[in-house]
């Protein structure tokens, strides 16, 4: 479903000529959404080959997403194959992802498992919440690895000391 690579490259040039200042690219379309939001059975860095080809034909920055791994993204950015790594679902699993990368605490990162437990309900419910829908019993957007996802407004998750003191 969708267009082939050559048609996509031609469209990207049109968008650049029309004034777009960046392209956030993946292989997904409405009918093949799984390329834009790859589930667990899709390979890591699954959009990389096509997006690096896109980078060769346009002069504006190109961002790639799709189960991107930081080491692969870093190497591709260093080599000029793309300009940035697109990150979305990973922040649901671990909101401190970037901090842990910067501090090289790789073993502390809670990786997104691409389960779509929190991501796809966003579309079903036209937003997110921290409740169970009474009509169909579905939970509105809870990450399988991070139960705090979308519940920040309802619950106070701030860590508090057992004994407080005034300093």
Describe each PLM feature range.
Residues 1-167:
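Flavin-dependent oxidoreductase catalytic cores
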